[in-house]
């Protein structure tokens, strides 16, 4: 077999491969022999069909199958011989497929970039520290109460935070539009569920009242057919209900699995959850800074095949998350390219750090992470057991731990500054970083 490789770009390779005709003929004959043993042809006993008849009937298909298999196997042999690491499937360009002659084809593909991760010393990280103060705990209890708000019908005009039961019909240019009408919809005023002006226009309304709202859809509205257009909504208020916060009592605590210990036990459990959230938030922010630093100090070119595959994965995730009747490939690729590039580049960099420093998942840390996650459940021992009985889930935890070990490796050489902040600041989400 003859192989030659041309570097067409930094990552693209054009590999010309010539396979001896004898190898093709051997594969063709092998298939014909297998076919002859099981072929059922009128006038012949099974296994007794002349080879000339087998070739006449099945020769073309056998050759096509043989060529496909030989291309696949010879491509693999060639990349091993040339010590290439393909990123994605090759594009095959046949040059000579004529029977009795050598098979010639060209495989065009990308390879993974070869690089050494460096620049740890130039990475700066601000590592936060915080405690859960009593005031933070009290604020969280208020949030939990609000999340479990009950609504009771009130005989008064609607206010912000009231829940209204409404019927409405929306029209654009006098015509009812799809998705613009509903009956018996529950709407909390001030929730921001509806377009600007809708909820505000119902403040002061009473049960049985009808209001007409003339509103304009935002220019960036998700339904492009309605974006920027003026609509008329006729709204009938069926009921007005006011919010009632639940008392901090045994009934309320039981909703969170706390059946004993009263308010003190409930506060203890909530504090534990807040401390767990705090640890995770601090760890996540340190990790994001490290990853940003690795991106900045290790610019690498991304194989287009990997980028395309990642865009496809993000499209599927978006459809699964937001639902709807849209197909993944209907979502514009450019919506996901920055995120896809960041994920692909970081995946390559992290893999290279693991390779350079010969990192292996620390099984003690794996168990510690599983126990930390399990502590959020009422039966933590069962959760731990479930992870260790599910190899796929266990390997996912190992991957997360390995990534943490990469972060620790970088932190050993990076410039790290410790900073004490409030609980609220420590857990506050940061804006998702973008790819360069």
Swiss-Prot record:
Keywords on record: Cell cycle, Cell division, Chaperone, Cytoplasm, Isomerase, Rotamase
Recorded GO CC terms: cytoplasm
Primary localization: cytoplasm
Pfam families: FKBP_C, Trigger_C, Trigger_N
Ranges where the PPIase FKBP-type domain occurs: 161-246
Enzymatic reactions: [protein]-peptidylproline (omega=180) = [protein]-peptidylproline (omega=0)
Biological process according to GO: 'de novo' cotranslational protein folding; cell division; chaperone-mediated protein folding; protein transport; protein unfolding
SUPFAM superfamilies recorded: FKBP-like, Triger factor/SurA peptide-binding domain-like, Trigger factor ribosome-binding domain
Keyword presence, Oxidoreductase: no
Location in or out of the cell: Cytoplasm
E.C. designation(s): 5.2.1.8
UniProt entry tagged with the keyword Cytoplasm: yes
Gene Ontology MF terms in the entry: peptidyl-prolyl cis-trans isomerase activity; protein folding chaperone; ribosome binding
Family: Belongs to the FKBP-type PPIase family. Tig subfamily.
Described function: Involved in protein export. Acts as a chaperone by maintaining the newly synthesized protein in an open conformation. Functions as a peptidyl-prolyl cis-trans isomerase.
Domain notes: Consists of 3 domains; the N-terminus binds the ribosome, the middle domain has PPIase activity, while the C-terminus has intrinsic chaperone activity on its own.
Protein name as catalogued: Trigger factor
Source organism per UniProt: Pseudomonas fluorescens (strain Pf0-1)
